[in-house]
């Protein structure tokens, strides 16, 4: 049990180090560039401006006002797309680093139970949570599962601590995979 605890602590430490490495790479390739700074400031400004306009608009607002809001939403969407494209080059570098590091660490922890889950994962996640482990106890956790969970959560928190995460206003306006969709349809 003590080796399992030591492995878990080591994996959390590895996740912190790889998240810091990823943010360092992103800072070098993206965050310090003038283009990124300009686009980020523009997105922030547009998000706040659009939020204010949406708060003041009424149901009986004129067609002209609704058109202005639609144009601003389109402009914001384009700037968000440009911002994503600027960040894309660092994503390739980070993906390459993470893949290389994950392969190396996966070979070190191959076949070792690194943690015990307090639940049985859903069947479609069991392939990841129980990867390269012997036995049928699906509460056993493999390196890859713990590493991915730790890296995802730690990296987000590091971005917030360093002030590099997108603002709530920009995230809210952009929609995104898990966020609410943009409310452009409300004015149609």
UniProtKB/Swiss-Prot annotation:
Intramembrane stretches: 121-130
Coiled coil: 32-89
Description of how the protein assembles with itself and partners: Homodimer and homotetramer. Component of the multi-pass translocon (MPT) complex.
Role according to the record: Calcium-selective channel required to prevent calcium stores from overfilling, thereby playing a key role in calcium homeostasis. In response to endoplasmic reticulum (ER) overloading, assembles into a homotetramer, forming a functional calcium-selective channel, regulating the calcium content in endoplasmic reticulum store. Component of the multi-pass translocon (MPT) complex that mediates insertion of multi-pass membrane proteins into the lipid bilayer of membranes.
SMART domains membership: DUF106
Family: Belongs to the TMCO1 family.
Keyword Chloroplast annotated: no
GO (cellular component) term, any one: cytoplasm
Cytoplasmic side of membrane: 33-86, 163-188
Sequence ranges on the Lumenal membrane side: 1-4, 107-120, 131-140
Alphabetized InterPro entries for the sequence: EMC3/TMCO1, TMCO1
Gene: tmco1
Name recorded for this polypeptide: Calcium load-activated calcium channel
Subcellular compartments: Endoplasmic reticulum membrane; Golgi apparatus membrane
Tree of life domain: Eukaryota
Spans through the membrane: 5-32, 87-106, 141-162
């Amino acid at each position: 049990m003590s080796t399992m605890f030591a492995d878990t602590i080591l994996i959390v430490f590895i996740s912190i180090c790889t998240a810091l490495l990823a943010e360092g790479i992103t800072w070098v390739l993206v965050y310090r560039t003038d283009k990124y700074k300009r686009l980020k400031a523009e997105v922030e400004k547009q998000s706040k401006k659009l939020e204010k306009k949406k708060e003041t608009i009424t149901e009986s607002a004129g067609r002209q006002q609704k058109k202005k809001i639609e144009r601003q939403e389109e402009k914001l969407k384009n700037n968000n797309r440009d911002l994503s494209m600027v960040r894309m080059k660092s994503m390739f570098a980070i993906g390459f680093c993470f893949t290389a590091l994950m392969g190396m660490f996966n070979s070190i922890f191959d076949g070792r139970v690194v943690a015990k889950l307090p639940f049985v994962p859903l069947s479609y996640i069991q392939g990841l949570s129980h990867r390269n482990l012997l036995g049928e106890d699906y509460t056993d956790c493999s390196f890859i599962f713990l590493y991915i969970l730790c890296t995802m959560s730690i990296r987000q928190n590091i971005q917030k601590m360093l002030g590099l995460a997108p603002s709530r206003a920009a995230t809210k306006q952009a929609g995104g995979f898990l966020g609410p969709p943009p409310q452009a349809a409300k004015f149609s």
